From Swiss-Prot:
Residues carrying sugar: 132
Native species: Canis lupus familiaris (Dog)
Annotated GO biological process: proteolysis
Name this polypeptide is given: Tryptase
PROSITE patterns: TRYPSIN_DOM, TRYPSIN_HIS, TRYPSIN_SER
Catalytic residues of the enzyme: 74, 121, 224
Paired cysteines (S-S): 59-75, 155-230, 188-211, 220-248
Propeptide residues, chain positions: 21-30
InterPro entries: Peptidase_S1_PA, Peptidase_S1_PA_chymotrypsin, Peptidase_S1A, Trypsin_dom, TRYPSIN_HIS, TRYPSIN_SER
């Protein structure tokens, strides 16, 4: 059996941050300006794997219940991937090194999803069996329905994606983290109109979206579907799901996330409020 290092080098040669959905240039798949996450942090982080020559990392996700994972719809759609073609890897410090892949029972994509730019970029994966919760594996807390995340809220995004636009995460593929500043939706919308011929009356950043990041810290291609979590009164709440953006850590182009609080009613049509 090849050593983990040999396997990692072989994977790197074929590792391209590809999502099964179109429009990849706008999808987020990496962490810019971050550092390796401590092994004891982010116990809800998961890696989504797509069947191929090997189970390839395509997106991030978050454990929100012992049997449910939250991710972006563009990771599994718009034509829903068969559950048999997807596996979930729970919190892993280095991709591919200690895989224990979990089968998926069903995939639920939001019915209003078409493209990330049009919103509703959210999906749920039901695992075949509930996982054992421990200090290393824990669901993240969803925010209350009226929870807002104003500028200045301490928020972090995590993932295994690109470290710069077009620069894949190198071996040993560590989980990365970066603190990102929240950008108010109105300001984010103004920034995204800069340099575009789109009229000011056309809303780019919609009410079901949330913006975070700047030219020094951002999510990138590979991080798609992963969690944006914010510390509120001592509790980590999942504010967003990594969705889309223009480039990575570009001026006036914050990362755009699906606003989790906006979709709580939809989430709880499937996911019990209590484990």
């Amino acid at each position: 059996m090849p050593s983990p290092l040999v396997l990692a080098l072989a994977l790197l040669g074929s590792l391209v941050p590809v999502s099964p959905a179109p429009g990849q240039a706008l999808q987020r798949v990496g962490i810019v300006g971050g550092r390796e996450a401590p092994g004891s942090k982010w116990p809800w982080q998961v890696s989504l794997r797509l069947k191929g020559q090997y189970w390839r990392h395509i997106c991030g996700g978050s454990l929100i219940h012992p049997q449910w994972v939250l991710t972006a719809a563009h990771c599994v759609g718009p034509n829903v991937v068969c559950p048999e073609e997807i596996r979930v890897q729970l919190r892993e410090q280095h991709l591919y090194y200690q895989d224990h892949l979990l089968p998926v029972n069903r995939i639920v994509m939001h019915p209003n999803y078409y493209t990330p730019e049009n919103g509703a970029d959210i999906a749920l994966l039901e695992l075949e069996d509930p996982v054992n919760v421990s200090a290393h594996v824990q669901p993240v807390t969803l925010p209350p329905a009226l929870q807002t995340f104003p500028t200045g809220t301490p928020c972090w995004v995590t993932g295994w994606g690109d470290v710069h636009s077009g620069t894949p995460l190198p071996p040993p593929f560590p989980l990365k983290q970066v603190k990102v500043p929240i950008v108010e939706n109105s300001m984010c919308d103004v920034q995204y109109h800069l340099g575009l011929s789109t009229g000011d009356g056309v809303r780019i950043v919609r009410e079901d979206m949330l913006c975070a990041g700047n030219s020094k810290s951002d999510s990138c291609q590979g991080d798609s579907g992963g969690p944006l979590v914010c510390r509120v009164r001592g509790v980590w709440l999942q504010a967003g799901v990594v969705s889309w953006g223009e480039g990575c850590a570009q001026p006036n182009r914050p990362g755009i996330y699906t606003r989790v609080a906006y979709y709580l009613d939809w989430i709880h049509q499937y996911v019990p409020k209590e484990p």
